[in-house]
Amino acid sequence: MIINPYDALATIYGQGTAAYEVINDANNPKLDNAIICAGGGGLTAGSCISIKHINPECNVFTAEPEEWNDHQLSFEKNERVAMDTNRGGLCDGLLTPMPGEIPFAINTHFGVKGLAASDQAVCEAMRFAFNRLNLKLEPSGAVALACLLQNKEKFKGTRTLVMLSGGNVDQKTFSECLAKANP
């Protein structure tokens, strides 16, 4: 049996528990926004279901690297857009060719919008997380924070959940990213 990591309802529902737990641990705060990293879109879709159940007015955003922003482009065109898969990228955990069919339907239903961050912003987010939050994030796990930091004015004065997901980074990549980040 193969279970799709993002294009299966059971997986999406399971991934939605991450947002549910965060909201409950924070005593159900009134959120204005949530920014969630997206590869196939399952984590965003599941989280969106949980968030919108508790807080229907919350704006939900996918976070992706600029060169792999298939969700952002798909939301703008209101149809799934495929990316050129003949190239790599810093955020290798998010490099899916297009949004999953089921997650795209869920995310579109809830009015999710897309954000994208540059590799430079991702490196700066990794440095910020390491220096200020004592978290060692992989590039894919830092992209939501990168989107927040790259769009400070958009989110200024709001209560925004930023999903930091993933710390699976080799020391070479981590060191290179920290060196590239602006101090």
What are these regions (language model features)?
Residues 1-183:
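PLP-dependent amino-acid enzyme catalytic core
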